[in-house]
């Protein structure tokens, strides 16, 4: 009787393990399929615009900044008008990104999408920009009202 009980418990354990592994594999496959159906380009554009700015960093000392210092009023007027278009475009990228990412049904899958963006874009960035990108990706997750991203590791280990 004891051998039968042990055998039965072992059999139940194996069935439970197989079902669990099958469910996990199904979730992985489902997320992979969802990611293939989502266009991450608007997200990548939005993030790159955020981390690279629009040329108005104070530490840049190029000709445009020199012109800005010598003709401040006129250039500011032009830049304000340009900024509106760029802001609208940036807002458009963010909105398109949120729409695309809303197709991903779970926080884990959304995290994988953010990790993919990080992986795709971070190769050409300096360490400081990579850190800023991590921060902007988390901000994007908040703005798009994704699920909890607490356990989402975006750090790039290059």
From Swiss-Prot:
InterPro entries: Bifun_inhib/LTP/seed_sf (IPR036312), Bifunc_inhib/LTP/seed_store (IPR016140), Napin/2SS/CON (IPR000617). Keywords: Disulfide bond, Seed storage protein, Signal, Storage protein. The keyword Disulfide bond applies. Residues 65-81 form a propeptide. Expressed in cotyledons. Maximal expression in parenchyma cells undergoing DNA endoreduplication and cell expansion but not in actively dividing cells of the cotyledon. Residues 1-21 form the signal peptide. This is 2S seed storage albumin protein. The keyword Disulfide bond applies. Disulfide bonds: none annotated. The lineage of its organism: Eukaryota, Viridiplantae, Streptophyta, Embryophyta, Tracheophyta. A motif (Cell attachment site) lies at residues 54-56. The protein consists of two chains linked by 2 disulfide bonds. One of its GO terms (molecular function) is nutrient reservoir activity. It comes from the Eukaryota. Belongs to the 2S seed storage albumins family.
